Amino acid sequence: MSNIWSKEETLWSFALYGTAVGAGTLFLPIQLGSAGAVVLFITALVAWPLTYWPHKALCQFILSSKTSAGEGITGAVTHYYGKKIGNLITTLYFIAFFVVVLIYAVAITNSLTEQLAKHMVIDLRIRMLVSLGVVLILNLIFLMGRHATIRVMGFLVFPLIAYFLFLSIYLVGSWQPDLLTTQVEFNQNTLHQIWISIPVMVFAFSHTPIISTFAIDRREKYGEHAMDKCKKIMKVAYLIICISVLFFVFSCLLSIPPSYIEAAKEEGVTILSALSMLPNAPAWLSISGIIVAVVAMSKSFLGTYFGVIEGATEVVKTTLQQVGVKKSRAFNRALSIMLVSLITFIVCCINPNAISMIYAISGPLIAMILFIMPTLSTYLIPALKPWRSIGNLITLIVGILCVSVMFFS
């Protein structure tokens, strides 16, 4: 049996699942619910290939490069395109996931202020205090160290997955099929909704940061056979991810009237908040919903924050060197944490709409790295020509459509 499927492959499947399913899963039903049933059904059809193809392409891109042990995306880009393009991709990578951190922080703040609003009037002063508390607490957890934080995150994965599955099954009793069947119409607005929903889908299913670690680990163990091992794990993991996420999305949208989804979208909160808004929502759902939403987004925040701080440290180091100042790595890192925290606090106070940030900034930037860079490279780099395929071409086209939302939406 171990020759067919090993314990290690099971652990990596859980790692991919735990990284992919989280805060993004809570935003996907909001966008798809407001976009209409046609967009929902199309998403269900394309979810697996548009999760598998881009992550597989990125894995191939990393594994095909002749880089030093332990080098991931940045090393691969530098190998193929040189140091300048490598630095550009590193900066783009930093910006893309810095925006993700901002989205999670804003959504956590909104979820907490929404609960406080039931007991008091929320003005700017209260929002500033909540924003400050969110930023400070998340930083305190982060400063516990990488290993301690990862242990906490790993401990939270299974309860979160169990909650999503339990809630999906629980809501089956409240399904109202007419909530979807009455929305089935295809017109010009449907095409527009499909277009602007692409970045949210990219955001929800993306787990780009772990792909470098995954590819490097497989290469160290299997060498030239690493890609076959990666594809084997990805096919199974992404099938489970897509089935469970789509079951959760359909279960929510078959239970929640569109007006509540629109209200949640306007407030910049997750689908769990939309569920708690329902008149007949049980008390346990409101309480557990806010806890799970905050925990899921905090887990995703911390998982992304490590990479953001590392990227910010490099940006600070380069900037200081350009003005003739050379400081220790500890100083650069401390300054990075302070600057990132300050910007996060300010954005939480301003309260931009989370969904709008996803489809206007975060989704398109992630698409540049995940959908466009590895697939376009198969047409630009002769050594990558064997990886050209219909799947890669479709991934490239979807990536370009996703990026176009940033400029034309």
From Swiss-Prot:
GO cellular component, one term: plasma membrane
Gene Ontology biological process terms, A to Z: amino acid transmembrane transport; amino acid transport
Regions of this protein lying in the Cytoplasmic compartment: 47-87, 149-151, 215-235, 298-329, 375-388
Pfam families found in the cross-reference section: Trp_Tyr_perm
GO molecular function: transmembrane transporter activity
InterPro entries: Amino_acid_transport_2
Disulfide bonds: none
Coiled-coil parts of chain: none
UniProt-annotated location(s): Cell inner membrane
Alphabetic keyword roster: Cell inner membrane, Cell membrane, Membrane, Transmembrane, Transmembrane helix, Transport
Spans through the membrane: 26-46, 88-108, 128-148, 152-172, 194-214, 236-256, 277-297, 330-350, 354-374, 389-409
Periplasmic domain ranges by topology: 1-25, 109-127, 173-193, 257-276, 351-353
Keyword Phosphoprotein: no
PANTHER family on file: INNER MEMBRANE TRANSPORT PROTEIN YQEG, SERINE TRANSPORTER
Family of the protein in this entry: Belongs to the amino acid/polyamine transporter 2 family. SdaC/TdcC subfamily.
Protein name: Inner membrane transport protein YqeG
Source organism: Escherichia coli (strain K12)
Gene, per the UniProt record: yqeG
